[in-house]
Amino acid sequence: MQHRKELQARTRDQLQTLELSTSLYDTAWVAMVPLRGSRQHPCFPQCVEWILQNQQDDGSWGTRGFGVAVTRDVLSSTLACVLALKRWNVGQEHIRRGLDFIGRNFSIAMDEQIAAPVGFNITFPGMLSLAMGMDLEFPVRQTDVDRLLHLREIELEREAGDHSYGRKAYMAYVTEGLGNLLEWDEIMMFQRKNGSFFNCPSTTAATLVNHYNDKALQYLNCLVSKFGSAVPTVYPLNIYCQLSWVDALEKMGISQYFVSEIKSILDTTYVSWLERDEEIMLDITTCAMAFRLLRMNGYHVSSVELSPVAEASSFRESLQGYLNDKKSLIELYKASKVSKSENESILDSIGSWSGSLLKESVCSNGVKKAPIFEEMKYALKFPFYTTLDRLDHKRNIERFDAKDSQMLKTEYLLPHANQDILALAVEDFSSSQSIYQDELNYLECWVKDEKLDQLPFARQKLTYCYLSAAATIFPRELSEARIAWAKNGVLTTVVDDFFDLGGSKEELENLIALVEKWDGHQEEFYSEQVRIVFSAIYTTVNQLGAKASALQGRDVTKHLTEIWLCLMRSMMTEAEWQRTKYVPTMEEYMANAVVSFALGPIVLPTLYFVGPKLQEDVVRDHEYNELFRLMSTCGRLLNDSQGFERESLEGKLNSVSLLVHHSGGSISIDEAKMKAQKSIDTSRRNLLRLVLGEQGAVPRPCKQLFWKMCKIVHMFYSRTDGFSSPKEMVSAVNAVVKEPLKLKVSDPYGSILSGN
């Protein structure tokens, strides 16, 4: 417990003081800016001094762990630092050692298999050309130097015929590799309100080296004042970094420990969103992430702000599109999925083209296992509304890289990637898993005590029911909610099977009559099966009702019995339809089906266990009923689509067969399934709008339960009739409840595996 509190405290501190990693490359370019009115002196001598103090023993400038191979990034940073020192004629020994390092590793610059900073084939040869103009000599063959210089010529020739906005942005972004080849007005069109070019210190500094500009100098002055003698590779980056923190905390399953901090970050981001802050609006990745996180946390944000990238052609015209930036593609695709209305055509369009580009990238990537491609495949296969929280948490924890970095002109570490967040997530998941195991053991005993395992007609689905509880209502303190959810899930499965397979007409009528009377001393059981089913429901509902009533400060047991009675009456209606061969209209079927799908006894009682007090007028409110209807509609139609063939063989009607029947043969089965899918999409979007809305009688934690169940039915029925497939969910159950975490080892230092 103490260790967990320490980890939380350190993480809070890190949230408050976001630290950006130092960029030697950008610092070197800032060091090259001359003093206004005296081009023989540096404007930022402290940066020059920092370069002198931070050369590595091997002559390089760059951050590398022991035994880690030299990268093109390190070569680029080293050459930039050499140029900065030569520009002011200081550090002759440093320059010599730097040139020797470059000479020893020059082949790496020409190795296309090694990851390169953005624009490397322009910036590195450009710096080589600048170095030779300063009479610097490299201990390498001239043919190798010429080969690299030729690379720049080839790239510039290839780009010459491209007059797109994206190409112009790219050329301006890598201006330090172009010298005077770029016209001043071609650069100026990309200057931001803060004076920078692309929020990039090296681009801004390189521009100042060739053309004086007051606003650009003010930006660099501000930068050096804030960071001292060494600058980051992007600034400002506050919004992106803070949103990345929020995203990471949610993905790792520990956001519940930082509720106030997350709210503060999102409140601030929302203000920036409303003000159309350039830090958000001019960066596609940040804009898409802000939209997704703000919307999913209940803030009102319009998808209109994403209209500049509504079409693939618009994305390709941007700098990120020109660079084929996978991260921005993923974020756009994720953002497109949080649609709350059929009228958000912008999101539909973004989802269509970004999904196509992601699929193309995944296919062309082949069998490579790079993390970014794994993330792309996962995003395509599992939209957020088909995933279970705890399964996602485990996957993200096991794949978390505490040395995670991104590559722009140089590599930089992401502030949220650190051992503390990983250690906290590991501790939380592992301790929660221990609780889940105890709860599952208790439930297994409960099934036997209630003799539910003695019913030959009933599917034994306890582990699935408990999975849906533990994987979504995951915080440790919500044990009573998980138990209620799982018990009622088991009981609804038993009752469903009893009405479908196990019970005669007389038995079903007897069971309903018993629930109507709700008398524990009743002895008028038509059969032993009825006795077991009723006794289990009666005992469980009364026990849960007593606990819920104590929490709510009023008696809610009657409401719980009403829920069960509604379910059984709807199931009896379906049984009568089947017995009499009655074919209902689609409207009749769906009005009954949203109840008979049996989510009511699972979700509605659990609302009483998640915190808020619900007055009786809330559970009678239109919003409450609409949340239930939309959730159940998704579940019923998903189940009908996947179970159509099986149910047809059993002689059962469902929405798909009814659509075909009532069309008079004008639509096919596939067309009926497509129509059902459209209704699913509409219901899911409308449900999300209600869940995220600030207005209404139902408290947000309670609304979230309806959404959690919607995700569960999407996960269970999105590809197969999962609840009827014995092997489909086994690995998911084991992952959440039984199997311990298997952490990756990203480096030989700081691993927390030994402590797990």
UniProtKB/Swiss-Prot annotation:
Tissue: Highly expressed in panicles and at lower levels in leaves and stems.
Residues given in the record as Mg(2+) 1 binding sites: 496, 500
Main location class: plastid
Annotated metabolic or biological route of this protein: Plant hormone biosynthesis; gibberellin biosynthesis
UniProt keywords, alphabetically: Chloroplast, Lyase, Magnesium, Metal-binding, Plastid, Transit peptide
Uppermost EC category: lyase
EC numbers on record: 4.2.3.19
GO CC, any one term: chloroplast
Annotated PANTHER family: ENT-COPALYL DIPHOSPHATE SYNTHASE, CHLOROPLASTIC, ENT-KAUR-16-ENE SYNTHASE, CHLOROPLASTIC
UniProt remark on domains: The Asp-Asp-Xaa-Xaa-Asp/Glu (DDXXD/E) motif is important for the catalytic activity, presumably through binding to Mg(2+).
Additional remark text: Plants lacking KS1 display a dwarf phenotype with normal root development, but severe stunting of shoots in seedlings, dark green leaves and failure to initiate flowering. This phenotype can be rescued by treatment with exogenous gibberellin.
Function statement: Catalyzes the conversion of ent-copalyl diphosphate to the gibberellin precursor ent-kaur-16-ene.
Name of protein: Ent-kaur-16-ene synthase, chloroplastic
Species name: Oryza sativa subsp. japonica (Rice)
